[in-house]
Amino acid sequence: MLLTSTNTLKISSQRKEWEAKDLTGMFHGQVNGRVKIPASDREGPMSSSIKEMLNNVELSVSSYDTAWAAMVPALDSSKQPLFPKYLSWVMENQKSDGSWGLDLNHPLLIKDSLSSTLACVLTLQRWNVGQQLVHKGLDFIGSNIWAATDESQHSPTGFNMIFPSMIECGTNMGLNLPLNPSSIEAMLIKRDLETESACSLKGTSNLAYVAEGLTRLDDWKDVMKYQRSNGSFFNSPSSTAAAFIHLRDEKCFDYLNSLSKRFENAVPTIYPFDIFTRVSILDILEKLGIDRYISKDKERTLDDLHRCWMKGSDEIFLDPTCSAMAFRLLRTNGYAISSDALSKFEEQKHLYNPKDIKCVLELFKASQMAIFQNEPTLDRIYAWTSTYLKEKLLKGVISDKSLREEVDFVLKHPHARLERIENRKFIESYNVDNVSLTKTSYRFCNVDERYLLTFACQDFNICQSMHQKELDDLERWVIERRLSDLKYARQKVKYAYFAIACRLFQPDFLDARISWVQNSVILTVVDDFFEVGGSLEALSNLIELVERWDEHLTVGYKSEEVKILFHAIYDTINDLADKAYRKQGRCVKRHLVDTWLIYLKSVLKEAEWVTNKTVTTMDEYISNGYISAGSGPIIFSSLYFLEVLSEEIVNSEEYKNLYMHTSMICRLLNDRVQAKSDGAQGKQNSVSLQVIHGNGIITEEEAVKEVTRMIEYHRRELLRMVVETEGSIVPKACKDVFWLMSRILHLFYMSDDGYSSPTKMIHAADAIINEPIIVSQK
């Protein structure tokens, strides 16, 4: 569980509602404070700072776990602690109010303070030292015991089993606990009920994680099968210490001894934590949008993670959160791994903390990485995690605001999550005093989260300033090309720029952005011309002009609209081809012209079908429709500004299939939301054709379901091609653009035609292009 402190570095703004279908909560203002942003993504001190945070992560000290480790008796004497240094730490680190724990002053973390304080009191009583500290600790417990049964308080994992057991242990030690006997009895009854429920319904894995709450010898025997190869229970010092106290297990001792050698005076709540913490920090950097500053270190971290994955590391595979995050990061970045490794999490009962919303969310996100048509493990994980998260969201039980907003966003946009939108939302909700809560609270010690947040905000805003200038230039280009004179046409320069800026936002990708937007704008106007403004004769005239590219003056223009459209295409392609030559070292104009020609002919064919009232077969429609969807001219030209693409790559089956799957997604998504409007205009699409050829057997609802199935098929195939590296010759940066197109299309066509709507996407676009983020120190 992630928690937000009440004392924070806050992001302030004037909030606007925006949607795509229900996206909410963007901010505007400007950054306060200065952090030097490198001129290039590969320069400056920022890289060194983040590298240090990524490679040398330390967790905060855990009073709770240190107290349990301090309770372990010496091997040769039950009257002496095995680790006296831990006992000394407990005696030296009581807070002024009598409690132990992180100095958070969080009003909803009192249960955590109660748990840590009682563990420390038990330790002191166990060794009959620090009686004054004991009395102060008991006073704190007595003053705050109300929180133990307050459902609004954040509850440490297993609190209802562990805390009553510690109370029972204290009573047996002779402690005069300032508690009402009836309250103690009620907590003990609740503990026993939860223990029985855990045994009967969920197995015993979650019992092993909260082993210090067990009281029966049979329970201890049951949980021993969850002991890890390093001797611990789920890398938990407290659980392992409790197990050793009860069973004197040699492997438990070895683990505890390794802790003592690694940590001087006190222990964290998780150990080892190298993989988990590095994965967590890398995930944070990606969400903040600044991971590009440490690309080489990121690659090394992922290589290390992959090696641990292939070795079957306990630190990964016995922790569902770590497993899910590692799976998502590795598969996203092209590592060949099987989803079968997540099979143990196909049912919620197998989680050792089944109520951990953060864990369930990570499993849900991992389930979205299905790249094969038959990945039943991911399908089953998706089924239960999506249901569980929707239920918790509906009931309003996710108390942490940042986590609640992330769950809401991810559920509503499973396939439409765009990088820059997620960066902004994460920056907005990011809290520099966040702590995580498992059996006790903890945080990363050497991660300067204030610095990261300030840097991420300024990085976002600097890129945004660049976007604003580019968009101004593009809007002037629309006027200069006279495209704005065609009043029947949709003017979508801002939406087009928003789409590409959500992924290719870095300064280096200027030409790719310009190419994407110019082709998108022209294509939208041409599409409207074919549907609204032009006769078949005019359409044929435009195609002939493109066919006679260098000799177009011999053709002539059937209308002023044709002249405007042709010269927009002609001048833009010539200009882009000249720029691309400098990147590619060869002329790519013929490919760009042919791409446009193929698109224009496919749209003309559809116009002829409408005019002649032709009913095609489904195969005829699809084989033409994925081309008329129009992604070809937009994507192909942009890719020439990302990487050097040989003719072998451009003509490869891989390249063609990436385009085909992307275009199929485009066509089918559009058809699904426009079935009724297309029918009213006499146009056929993949929904109506199924009904027509179904001879009364297939309903429109069934046809929509089949189209949805087809979309998912092509989405998985596309994602597989994007992430797989073996046998691939298309550069990863280029494959990512195909995937971007898929996600932006899912966003635009989530529930209706958001691209054509003049207002539906405007606030989302403004959030990326026009509204900077403001950070204020409070």
UniProtKB/Swiss-Prot annotation:
Q: Which cofactor does it need?
A: Mg(2+)
Q: What is its main location?
A: plastid
Report the cofactor remark: Binds 3 Mg(2+) ions per subunit.
Motif DDXXD motif covers 527-531
Spell out the InterPro entries in the cross-references. Isoprenoid_synthase_dom_sf, Terpene_synth_N, Terpene_synth_N_sf, Terpene_synthase-like, Terpene_synthase_metal-bd, Terpenoid_cyclase/PrenylTrfase
Q: Which GO terms describe its molecular function?
A: ent-kaurene synthase activity; ent-sandaracopimaradiene synthase activity; magnesium ion binding; terpene synthase activity
Pfam families named in the record: Terpene_synth (PF01397), Terpene_synth_C (PF03936)
In this chain, Mg(2+) 3 is annotated as bound at N670, D671, D678
Which residues are listed for Mg(2+) 2 binding in this entry? Answer: D527, E531
Q: In which pathway does it act?
A: Secondary metabolite biosynthesis; terpenoid biosynthesis
Q: Which residues cross the membrane?
A: none
Q: Transit peptide: which range?
A: 1-35
- Domain note: The Asp-Asp-Xaa-Xaa-Asp/Glu (DDXXD/E) motif is important for the catalytic activity, presumably through binding to Mg(2+).
Q: Which family does it belong to?
A: Belongs to the terpene synthase family.
> What is the recorded name of this protein?
Ent-sandaracopimaradiene synthase KSL3, chloroplastic
Q: To which species is this protein native?
A: Ricinus communis (Castor bean)
